[in-house]
């Protein structure tokens, strides 16, 4: 058997043309209509006015003013000189070790 030339199919061919498809509207965005009124009933109080957020917009209740909070350090560090010196020493030691490893 040759792949470019397979043997003919032994079964019977189609006896009649396919039935015509029913005509359907074509185009993007076509969907069948849903149930009237939508799938859920409207809320008992009705819908709020459309197109705007409910709060803080055109007559809605305003947000309360923000409270400013100041954070104050409750303990003053008097050993600033020692801490600065220790930080500088650690930085120098780290740089020296790093320089030694790279060279």
Curated annotation (Swiss-Prot):
The chain crosses the membrane at residues 80-97. Disulfide bonds: none annotated. It is found in: Membrane. Keywords: Membrane, Transmembrane, Transmembrane helix. Residues 1-45 have a biased composition (Pro residues). Belongs to the CYSTM1 family. This is Cysteine-rich and transmembrane domain-containing protein 1. It comes from Bos taurus.
